């Protein structure tokens, strides 16, 4: 009788607390995110306002995501260098959100404070059908707001924007003080 309730999996109370399963059904995520976009779309008048609203909501998620991830992944230790925090975003943050790492992390050739996180097929754009009049809409603005919050709460203030290039590219532009601090840490 007991096996009928557990269905071959370990019982809920016997699972370890340190690493809870964070799996969410893809169809449930798609439905919730589509409804979130529709909700925001009804309350704004332009694509720029819609992307700003999605970024604000992503910012709220990012603030709540950082602390549990740092405590699980790093044992409570925060990053102090720009490259290590970007690798944290590309790896553990992306895996917690989308189940895989981001496709690429690149630095701009001409600017030492600009980095790019490239995702060829972002999950947030997969289930959204965009009308012709809103063809510039990129729902990855939600992810950009989330990454901006994670970086800001980690002590690396930056402006993060989503662009269509090689799929979707998040452009991360750090403040001057962050780069100056990183260079002074390298000198030690």
Curated annotation (Swiss-Prot):
It is found in: Golgi apparatus, cis-Golgi network; Endoplasmic reticulum. One of its GO terms (cellular component) is TRAPPII protein complex. It comes from the Eukaryota. Belongs to the TRAPP small subunits family. BET3 subfamily. One of its GO terms (biological process) is endoplasmic reticulum to Golgi vesicle-mediated transport. Pfam families: TRAPP (PF04051). The keyword Endoplasmic reticulum applies. The gene is TRAPPC5. Part of the multisubunit TRAPP (transport protein particle) complex. May play a role in vesicular transport from endoplasmic reticulum to Golgi. Its main location: Golgi. InterPro entries: NO_sig/Golgi_transp_ligand-bd, TRAPP-I_su5, TRAPP_component. Keywords: Endoplasmic reticulum, ER-Golgi transport, Golgi apparatus, Transport. PANTHER family: 41-2 PROTEIN ANTIGEN-RELATED, TRAFFICKING PROTEIN PARTICLE COMPLEX SUBUNIT 5. This is Trafficking protein particle complex subunit 5.
């Amino acid at each position: 009788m007991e096996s009928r309730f557990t269905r071959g999996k370990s019982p809920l109370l016997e699972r370890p607390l340190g690493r809870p399963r964070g799996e969410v059904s893809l169809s449930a995520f798609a439905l919730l995110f589509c409804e979130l976009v529709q909700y925001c779309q009804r309350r704004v008048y332009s694509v720029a306002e819609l992307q700003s609203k999605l970024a604000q909501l992503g910012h709220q998620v990012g603030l709540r995501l950082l602390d549990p991830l740092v405590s699980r992944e790093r044992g409570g230790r925060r990053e102090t260098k720009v490259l290590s925090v970007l690798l944290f975003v590309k790896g553990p943050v992306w895996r917690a959100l989308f189940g895989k790492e981001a496709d690429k992390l690149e630095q701009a050739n001409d600017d030492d404070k600009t980095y790019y996180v490239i995702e060829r097929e972002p999950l947030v754009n997969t289930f959204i059908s965009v009308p012709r009049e809103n063809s510039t809409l990129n729902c990855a603005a939600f992810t950009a707001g989330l990454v901006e919050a994670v970086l800001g709460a980690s002590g690396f203030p930056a402006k993060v924007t989503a662009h269509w290039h090689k799929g979707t590219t998040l452009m991360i532009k750090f403040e001057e003080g962050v780069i100056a601090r990183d260079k002074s840490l390298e000198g030690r």
